[in-house]
Design a protein with these regions (language model features):
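Short metal-coordination and nucleic-acid-contact micro-motifs, chiefly zinc-binding Cys/His arrays
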Residues: 1-5, 22, 39
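Short cysteine-rich clusters marking metal-coordination/redox-active sites
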Residues: 8-11, 26-29
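Short functional micro-motifs and their immediate structural scaffolds
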Residues: 16-17, 34
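Short linker/helix segments within small regulatory modules
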Residues: 17-23
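Conserved N-terminal beta-strand and adjoining loop/helix that marks the start
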Residues: 28-52, 72
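Conserved Nudix-box catalytic region and its N-terminal flanking loop in Nudix hydrolases
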Residues: 47-89
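Active-site-adjacent beta-strand/loop module that shapes the phosphate/pyrophosphate-binding cleft
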Residues: 104-131
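NUDIX/MutT-family hydrolases
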Residues: 133-141
Length: 141
């Protein structure tokens, strides 16, 4: 990802050189940019029959493939808040309980850039799984 950035975002200098595997440093103004993973959330939602809710992606990347509900946390939003928002946006379901399970480093390929992510997985309970309806990034659930 660092290879995509050629100029310092502070002073515009072309002397914006890779200083480690996760950073570039400007030789003119001293600014150092670190690439850190973006926070992503994933929901495991089981209905009363023990069936896992999956959705089909409406958009690229990976349009048409199966996926779990979830997405990125927005600025000033906790991972749990982002999880609830993403599940509501994509499925119309209201998360009433989210239990953290595990996390996994990942890469999200978007607009020609590999964005490092830290995906956090949650087992979720929802208010009424009969109200599931694909919206936003989900073509179908």
């Amino acid at each position: 990802m660092l290879s995509k950035f050629k100029y310092c975002p502070i002073c515009g200098s072309s002397l914006f050189n890779i200083s480690s595997e996760k950073s570039r440093k400007c030789e003119d103004c001293g600014f150092e940019y670190f690439v850190n993973p973006s926070s992503a959330n994933v929901a495991f939602i089981l209905n009363n029959n023990g069936e896992l809710l999956v959705e089909r992606r409406k958009n690229n990347p990976a349009m048409g493939t199966l996926d779990l509900p979830g997405g990125f946390a927005d600025m000033n939003e906790t991972v749990e808040e982002g999880l609830k928002r993403e599940v509501m946006e994509e499925t119309g379901l209201e998360v009433t309980e989210a239990t953290y399970m595990f996390s996994k480093p990942n890469t999200y390929h978007y607009s020609g850039v590999d964005i490092p992510t830290l995906d956090m997985f949650f087992r979720c309970k929802v208010k009424d799984d009969n109200k599931v309806k694909a919206n936003d990034d989900a073509a179908e659930c």
